[in-house]
Amino acid sequence: MWVKLRISILLIISCLFGISIGNLLIVQYEANTFKPWEWKKPPMIINCYGERLSPNYINKSVDFWVMKGENILFVEYEPIKSLCTKRNTISNGVIKIYEGKDITFDSHKTLGLTKRKASITTGMVGANIYIRSGHYTIKNLLTHEMGHALGYTHVNIRGHIMHPITELMDDKFWIP
């Protein structure tokens, strides 16, 4: 009886240790890889922000990434109610753009935030972009967040579109 209990406890501890190591490796991989995740199929983009987010801003961001070799299935400029009402759900094959409320962000300095879901076996699954209310007009902000939704991470080089500080980013892009 005690032997079975000890083996069960040892198996549980081993599983928890394995999961922890796996998570640590994924975090390290994301931290040290410029584009850790790829879309297997081109995503569609849905404007869940609403009519205040002009198609011009979305098109500018999409065009930027398409010129860099990314593929987008299509852009839906009108909110799709069945998808957009699920603010905290990341939908498969979709990049949704939302108006972010102050509570969404961890700091008053954060203007945009992208939550993405990826799998080691399938790559990028989906992403939600949150732009702080009224800040979508800030140069390159939506393009930067769309970069995260497409699988890119930050680059700490002044002028790079993926620089983490808005004031230090520009419309330059290269793979470091």
Regions found by a protein language model. Name each.
Residues 1-9:
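Bacterial N-terminal signal peptides that target proteins for export
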Residues 42, 70-72, 158:
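Loop/turn elements at helix/coil->beta-strand transitions in domains of secreted/extracellular proteins
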Residues 55-145, 149, 153:
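Metzincin-family zinc-dependent endopeptidase catalytic domain
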Residues 152-175:
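Post-HEXXH active-site segment of zinc metalloproteases
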Residues 35, 41-42, 78, 163, ...:
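Intrinsic-disorder/low-complexity coil detector
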Residues 45-55, 128-137, 164-172:
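Second-shell loop/turn segments in exported
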